[in-house]
Amino acid sequence: METCAGPHPLRLFLCRMQLCLALLLGPWRPGTAEEVILLDSKASQAELGWTALPSNGWEEISGVDEHDRPIRTYQVCNVLEPNQDNWLQTGWISRGRGQRIFVELQFTLRDCSSIPGAAGTCKETFNVYYLETEADLGRGRPRLGGSRPRKIDTIAADESFTQGDLGERKMKLNTEVREIGPLSRRGFHLAFQDVGACVALVSVRVYYKQCRATVRGLATFPATAAESAFSTLVEVAGTCVAHSEGEPGSPPRMHCGADGEWLVPVGRCSCSAGFQERGDFCEACPPGFYKVSPRRPLCSPCPEHSRALENASTFCVCQDSYARSPTDPPSASCTRPPSAPRDLQYSLSRSPLVLRLRWLPPADSGGRSDVTYSLLCLRCGREGPAGACEPCGPRVAFLPRQAGLRERAATLLHLRPGARYTVRVAALNGVSGPAAAAGTTYAQVTVSTGPGAPWEEDEIRRDRVEPQSVSLSWREPIPAGAPGANDTEYEIRYYEKGQSEQTYSMVKTGAPTVTVTNLKPATRYVFQIRAASPGPSWEAQSFNPSIEVQTLGEAASGSRDQSPAIVVTVVTISALLVLGSVMSVLAIWRRPCSYGKGGGDAHDEEELYFHFKVPTRRTFLDPQSCGDLLQAVHLFAKELDAKSVTLERSLGGGRFGELCCGCLQLPGRQELLVAVHMLRDSASDSQRLGFLAEALTLGQFDHSHIVRLEGVVTRGSTLMIVTEYMSHGALDGFLRRHEGQLVAGQLMGLLPGLASAMKYLSEMGYVHRGLAARHVLVSSDLVCKISGFGRGPRDRSEAVYTTMSGRSPALWAAPETLQFGHFSSASDVWSFGIIMWEVMAFGERPYWDMSGQDVIKAVEDGFRLPPPRNCPNLLHRLMLDCWQKDPGERPRFSQIHSILSKMVQDPEPPKCALTTCPRPPTPLADRAFSTFPSFGSVGAWLEALDLCRYKDSFAAAGYGSLEAVAEMTAQDLVSLGISLAEHREALLSGISALQARVLQLQGQGVQV
């Protein structure tokens, strides 16, 4: 093996040049992908030992690099001899996991013209080959083992050097990279063929590319070899790092590209409860912090009055004497039971005997807003300690209720005269224990009702009962000999049962007995007794509980053998009297809420007013007929704790206030994404009633294609309606965003569900009044659901006028609604026909840019919307049926649902081409619309839009006529270079107006 000190001048010349270039080359700079080195000749400090044939061809020489490290190179320079065929074969190279292999060559090459006498024999290229094998061919064997190698390429130098370059020490090193593959065997040899060049191989580097091991999205991905095909991506599943977890059904994945780069990350991992993300790993929440769910990115400090003493806490425990309610989320502060109510006061009314209480809220609410009050009534003896008391029992009535009071006042009825009562008022909240009402956090008063006659019903004796008289007796309320015992006077009130208590008779007596005369035979009477006791003034006490006594019949006192016909007659008359009384009550009865159809006329309302109907499950409860809307809402909607609703972002303003997206966390249920409608603080009383009416309306519906009400929040300063979250928003906007991405069959598939929902509503007797695609919401799984239930009869006045947003309710309203303000299920059918047209037209505005007044006139003249592009004929005929002028001729929703379901299952085959199908005539062909003025040119049209700056752009693009402009699309405007969104929107609006003008002139409407 020769070195750089060899005697041959050409070799010495080549050796010096090659070594100087190698020193300047330095270490190779890697790319962004990871390269797995299979061979690097510069890394070998020993002889390479490659096979050279013949022996006087390629030769190995040694030198040093810039770090004085030895490097091995091969050179050949037999340029003066013809017919050169010198081969150099590397050792066996294992391909490892690589299939697509890269070969990087660094070499120098002498310019043949700079070598005297070598013009006919010198070459400036050399060839590179490879041969796949399963094992090493070995050294010293015949060239490449006799097998046929595959040529990689003929290599030429970009720059060659001359004698002058060598003298000036100019370095001209060439680098070429070639790739081979895909390889299938375990390894391969490289071979270099010299055909007469003066060349030096400074470096041979063989490698394949792989995506380096990495951590992304808290998932580790192993090093992965790239595929051989350039367009092939290798999907690699990631492994979540410690203390993290993947999303269910969406494990973390990435794709390794052919160039060794990671592409298309899908999914990610989230730190488990108790851990938070810190770079590429999850760290435990420190003491004092917690994380309850993987959905939360960071640990949160413990809420007030709670603590977390350990690392990785998933919740914070409450401090001593503090607690959380079962309905409180883990993020809620710990609270405690309230203190006792303050300043408990009472007033006692003697006639009737009524005890009224009022108090102030506790000084300490425990940190909660859900403070309620509970009353405990104890009846005590006239003498003795309060410990001798016993519960009052069911006799005493509490208004408005005994427990769960939010009011700070209560009234007790049916107390006994001459008794002593102790009433305790306890303050409770969400963390009060079950025995809190009997605990120590209460205020109490003790009240004596004074002497009286606390008789039970069985303490009044029926001494004698005759056809026209009744004798009663009772015990004296004050024992004989006690002060005032002889001064007690009694009042006895009586009346016929079934008669009003206002038509009673009264007798008085000084003894505990009485005989009442002049009664009717065989008649049931009600008797009540009370005592008047002495004092500074005679105090009238309340009457005792009523007792009933029936006088005997005339025949009963004379003969027991009297015919039973008289008894039957008396009973019959009594029954008729009772029935008459009941009917009288029903005749004047007024119920707080009316059940019936939401769209009935005045005659229907009269009928409902005078006839009682038992409400059924499928009968709509009209909010306008309810006296107490809040109470009605609680009958149909679940009351939610405001703390269970977390607001995340605003979705804009609603009819009554803010509309937000949030999360609902209920005990035992997963967190749910919801839409929250909040009533603004400045809302008027009428807006508050409208808000409650919308909640009551939503709460009555249970259908898979009607927006679901999750609950309401009515306790607190902010009223909320919580519904399911529909991620794709309104149907019209969804269709516009996906125009051209859905085929006609997919569009038609949206309609049967909506028809089913309207069938459900019509069967309940509900009239929507505002049916339109903008009031249909689309969920994340592309289910359409009816919404927009906040409209009512008060909204009728807007039916004719165009709104500021460009939406005119006249576009969806039936003729009878526009003319007479009459809403019915049939008017909803008309609106549903417009919805079907909107769906098939990808959310296009009905009647294009026609004003509300023009639409009213056109519909009255018989104009109907033409079929949208690719709309099946059967579906358009159904639309026309929905747009019949006579409401009685329109189909019912049950029929519409049946027809649409059959269309989806068995679509109508086209009967003719779109261009040959006959179109019915339209009366609009002969009538001009004043709404759309005529323009003489494109320039005049642009000036009318105040966008004349684009005249040259339109002209340069060939849009010289209004007919051509009418066919433009949004993409055409972008291609003109119109970058401002507001200008594009103004132009699109003007183009739509031109299209409507063209349709008017061409008569593309439909006459009915």
UniProtKB/Swiss-Prot annotation:
Residues 35-216 form the Eph LBD domain. One of its GO terms (cellular component) is extracellular region. The chain crosses the membrane at residues 566-586. It catalyses: L-tyrosyl-[protein] + ATP = O-phospho-L-tyrosyl-[protein] + ADP + H(+). Residues 340-452, 456-554 form the Fibronectin type-III domain. It comes from the Eukaryota. Glycans are attached at residues 311, 486. Keywords: ATP-binding, Cell membrane, Deafness, Glycoprotein, Kinase, Membrane, Non-syndromic deafness, Nucleotide-binding, Receptor, Repeat, Secreted, Signal, Transferase, Transmembrane, Transmembrane helix, Tyrosine-protein kinase. GO terms for molecular function: ATP binding; transmembrane-ephrin receptor activity. Residues 645-900 form the Protein kinase domain. Its EC number is 2.7.10.1. Changing residue 150 to H: In a gastric adenocarcinoma sample; somatic mutation. Residues 933-997 form the SAM domain. Residues 1-33 form the signal peptide. The keyword NAD does not apply. Coiled coil: none annotated. GO terms for biological process: axon guidance; ephrin receptor signaling pathway. InterPro entries: Eph_TM, Ephrin_rcpt_lig-bd_dom, Ephrin_rcpt_TKs, FN3_dom, FN3_sf, Galactose-bd-like_sf, Ig-like_fold, Kinase-like_dom_sf. Residues 587-1008 are cytoplasmic. Mainly expressed in testis. It is an enzyme of class 2 (transferase). Receptor for members of the ephrin-A family. Binds to EFNA3, EFNA4 and EFNA5. It is linked to Deafness, autosomal dominant, 88: A form of non-syndromic, sensorineural hearing loss. Sensorineural hearing loss results from damage to the neural receptors of the inner ear, the nerve pathways to the brain, or the area of the brain that receives sound information. DFNA88 is characterized by postlingual, progressive and severe hearing loss with tinnitus. Belongs to the protein kinase superfamily. Tyr protein kinase family. Ephrin receptor subfamily. The protein kinase domain is predicted to be catalytically inactive. This is Ephrin type-A receptor 10.
